[in-house]
């Protein structure tokens, strides 16, 4: 298994998990850009955001990803937060497994 996030999901690599359910896992970023910086990762491997089909199923999966990001922010007690997705290499994506950055904890 080459994907670092798939290896974290499989328990092969350590992480500081803050949330997990049947479809997603969330853990602290190893190179945080904010006082609180968590990655929300679907357990299903999809390389980049644009790989989700423009169908009802794709919309359902993307909706679940962002609902989970909101849920994670609440679990962390963030009063305000930023959500960021880097789509593809030219969009700044470094790990090619869809993930959402939830960043907060300022001030």
Describe the residue ranges of each PLM region:
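HIT superfamily nucleotide-processing domains
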Residues: 1-107
């Amino acid at each position: 298994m080459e994907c670092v996030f798939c290896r974290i999901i499989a328990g092969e690599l350590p992480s500081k998990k803050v949330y997990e359910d049947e479809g997603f896992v969330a853990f602290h970023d190893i190179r945080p850009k904010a006082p609180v910086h968590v990655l929300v990762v679907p357990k299903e491997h999809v390389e980049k955001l644009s790989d989700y089909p423009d169908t009802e199923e794709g919309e359902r999966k993307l909706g679940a990803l962002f609902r989970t990001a909101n849920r994670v922010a609440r679990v962390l007690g963030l009063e305000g937060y930023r959500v960021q997705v880097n789509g593809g290499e030219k969009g700044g994506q470094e790990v090619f497994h869809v993930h959402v950055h939830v960043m907060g904890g300022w001030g």
